[in-house]
From Swiss-Prot:
Subcellular location, record wording: Cytoplasm
Occurrences of domain KH (ranges): 565-624
Record's protein name: Polyribonucleotide nucleotidyltransferase
Quaternary structure, from the entry: Component of the RNA degradosome, which is a multiprotein complex involved in RNA processing and mRNA degradation.
Gene Ontology CC entries for this record: cytosol
SMART domains assigned: KH, S1
Domain (S1 motif): residue spans on this chain: 634-702
Length: 722
């Protein structure tokens, strides 16, 4: 992108610029000109899309800090696309769903690369300041984040690269496809990793086989090496000295005391298969350790004891798994927890399902609405409507805790989007099923992989509502424990296995292929073999879950729920649209108020009618047919006199249509004064006699009246009088 030339007088501005070719795009990384007070700042550009990434770190950790406070904020500025924000205040408000998801996308691959024990606060702010409509800025933001961290001096085991991958059978894999290219792609995958390892995968696909998905991951990792190399070269020229930071030394004496006093008891506790009982016992042991070891005389803090206690937990669980011993809940590495599936569990909703897998449970509800219920998304690339929504809720009671209730959190938004990715490939096309669909997953119990339970529940609830899905979908979460002496891939991981393991690998799909894949890896050295094994085990588990789901409901119900809105579509002449809408929308408003129906009209004359019941639907159809009806010669209509003139009367016989009853067509006898026969507002029956080239309609009352008796009797004699 062409930027302004700095003033020659400003000697302090000495930007360092690195350009490199990335597939078909030229990427520019610039530092030293903007945001110079941040620990590290890079302006990353790809084509005309630019993201300013500023990284700031605290030199000291807060006292008592026991977690790594990393925060990532991705924000899209309206001015980047030449737009002014809507709303009363006309400025950017709370983060959109896209901004939240991209923030998580950036956070996930960089978080494991900070050294263990590093607890200093780090903040990453990515601001989209210039945007092309056809380019997603997320990859640019990830590249910029990698570069900003690399030059910041903050301890970081990077750099990372990032790539988006598309796929078509004709073209194979596509590097960093545009929005328009993705419309025809069977895959949308984002991969991030270092020079040696893949760290993060986020994808949705149209039922692709496992080998294509794995190939896409490997292709992305190979291509992103251009980014890793370029960032490393930028760091050579512009990086600040790395902070002189060292992790706190482990208290060897305290560690030995914790291990000697509690390792055996912790090992026994991890044989308790019931989650709550296990947690209660571990809590007792943890409190006992703190009480015995964190005393004033010892000078040891409770946090130190708890930290070492957690390390013992991790060590015990991991060593058992790698050794092939039974897992925490007694299963082997490939067994899925017991399943229980119900549909139609709520009487008044459109579709519902209760999906239970072990101690993870989701109550999922589907709701159908009209086209106007679709979500309006005001994005940088333009406004669009989304007819499908999947919302995920994770109340604190699902894990037996008290907690904050309120605004939707980042985690809930991320899990909802993952579940949506899993379902998206099997949804019907809008022209085949013109309803707006909303799915809500209420996590009522949680012990691992609630997002994949949401996928299963969403598939069941949509089929229960009668939504014509192409195929049922199921999801499963895989885990990994890797030690020097071996590794184990775990099917259907528990929450503890997710926390204590090295990988969270979630796969959703149908019997024919993968629809979504998400992978987060906490260590380096995940090989192609490990990923292949994980995908294979995931497929076996997915097919097992699908078989259990199919026993309850194998295909969508033939009829929509009686609680769902009725739908009817009809086609009219586009010139008639104004008649249905009426002046200032008065006509269509009256139809909706009288019938209770919701009406959407396309510019091509297609009318979509939604109603809560059949009566409202039929009433709305009848009104529209009346308004759009054309006069037919010879047809008889019930009309109302709207105006009387010297030469006849104008009669309204169809909505918006008036015709003339000429004075000669009012009665068989000669009419001298129209007012003697007709009054304004009078209801009469008329017959359509003719429509001239200008569309004027001639009506008759006389044609519907019986002929006079005298005229009828004298007619034969009168034939020969002349």
């Amino acid at each position: 992108m062409q930027w302004g030339t700095p003033s020659q007088k400003d000697k302090k501005v000495n930007p360092v610029i690195k350009k490199f070719q990335y597939g078909n795009d030229t990427v520019t990384l610039e530092t030293g000109r903007i945001a110079r007070q941040a620990s590290g700042a890079v302006l990353a550009s790809m084509g005309q899309t630019s993201v300013l990434v500023a990284v700031t770190g605290s030199k000291e950790a807060k006292p008592g800090q026991d977690f790594f406070p990393l925060s990532v904020h991705y924000q899209e500025k309206a001015y980047a696309a030449g737009k002014i924000p809507g709303g009363f205040f006309k400025r950017e408000a709370r983060p959109s769903e896209k901004e939240t998801l991209t923030s998580r996308l950036i956070d996930r691959p960089i978080r494991p690369l900070f050294p263990n024990g590093f607890l200093n606060e780090v903040q990453v702010v990515c601001t989209v300041i210039s945007a092309e409509k056809d380019v997603d800025p997320d990859i640019v933001a990830m590249i910029g984040t990698s570069a900003a961290l690399a030059i910041s001096g903050i301890p970081f085991n990077g750099p990372i690269g990032a790539a988006r991958v598309g796929y078509t059978q004709e073209s194979g894999y596509l590097l960093n496809p545009t929005y328009s290219t993705l419309k025809t792609s069977e895959l949308d995958m984002v991969v991030a990793g270092t020079a040696d390892a893949v760290l993060m995968v986020e994808s949705e696909a149209k039922e692709l086989p496992e080998d294509i998905m794995l190939g896409a991951v490997l292709y992305a990792h190979q291509e992103m090496q251009a980014v890793v190399q370029a960032v490393a070269e930028l760091a050579k020229d512009a990086a600040k000295p790395v902070w002189d930071w060292k992790p706190e030394e482990v208290n060897a004496e305290l560690k030995a005391k914790v291990e000697h006093g509690f390792a055996d008891s912790v090992g026994v506790a991890y044989r308790i298969t019931d989650k709550q009982k296990r947690y209660d016992r571990l809590s007792e042991l943890r409190n006992q350790a703190v009480a015995e070891l964190a005393t004033e005389e010892s000078g040891v803090s409770a946090d130190e004891v708890k930290g070492l206690f957690a390390k013992i937990e991790k060590q015990i669980v991991r060593s058992r798994v790698v050794a092939g011993e039974p897992r925490i809940d007694g299963r082997d590495s490939k067994t899925v927890r017991p399943l229980h599936v119900e549909v139609g569990v709520l009487p008044k909703v459109h579709g519902s399902a209760l999906f239970t897998r072990g101690e993870t449970q989701a109550l999922v509800v589907s709701t159908l609405g009209s086209a106007r219920d679709a979500q309006i998304i005001d994005a940088l690339e333009g406004e669009r409507k989304d007819p499908f929504m999947l919302h995920y809720n994770f109340p604190p009671y699902s894990v037996g805790e008290c907690g904050r209730m309120g605004a939707t959190g980042r985690r809930e938004i991320g899990h909802g989007r993952l579940a949506r990715r899993g379902i998206g490939a099997v949804l019907p096309k809008e022209e085949d099923f013109p309803y707006t669909m909303r799915v809500v997953s209420e996590i009522t119990e949680s012990n691992g992989s609630s997002s994949m339970a949401s996928v299963c529940g969403a598939s069941l609830a949509l089929m229960d509502a009668g939504v014509p899905l192409k195929a049922p979908v199921a999801g499963i979460a895989m885990g990994l424990v890797k030690e020097d002496n071996g590794f184990a891939v775990l099917t259907d991981i528990l929450g503890d296995e997710d926390h204590l393991g090295d990988m969270d690998f979630k796969v959703a799909g149908t019997a024919d292929g993968v629809t979504a894949l998400q992978m987060d890896i906490k260590i380096e050295g995940i090989t192609e073999e490990i990923m292949e094994i994980a995908l294979g085990q995931a497929m076996d588990a997915r097919l097992h879950i699908l078989a259990e789901m199919n026993r309850v409901i194998a295909s969508p119900r033939k009829e929509l729920s009686e609680n769902a809105p009725q739908f009817h579509t009809m086609k009219i002449d586009p010139d008639k649209i104004r008649d249905i809408i009426g002046k200032g929308g008065a006509t269509i408003r009256s139809i909706t108020e009288e019938t209770g129906a919701s009406i959407d009209i396309d510019d091509n004359g297609t009318i979509k009618i939604y109603a809560d019941d059949g009566d409202g639907m039929q009433a709305a159809i009848a009104r529209i047919e009346e308004i759009t009806a054309e006069a037919e010669i010879g047809a008889v209509y019930q009309g109302k006199v709207v105006r009387i003139v010297d030469f006849g009367a104008f009669v309204n016989f169809l909505p918006g249509k008036d015709g003339l009853v000429h004075i000669s067509q009012i009665a068989h006898e000669r009419v001298q004064n129209v007012s003697d026969y007709l009054k304004e507002g009078q209801d009469i029956e008329v017959k359509c006699m003719d429509i001239d080239q200008r569309g004027r309609i001639k009506l008759s009352i006389k044609e519907l009246l019986p002929a006079p008796e005298a005229e009828t009797a004298e007619a034969p004699a009168g034939e020969g009088e002349e």
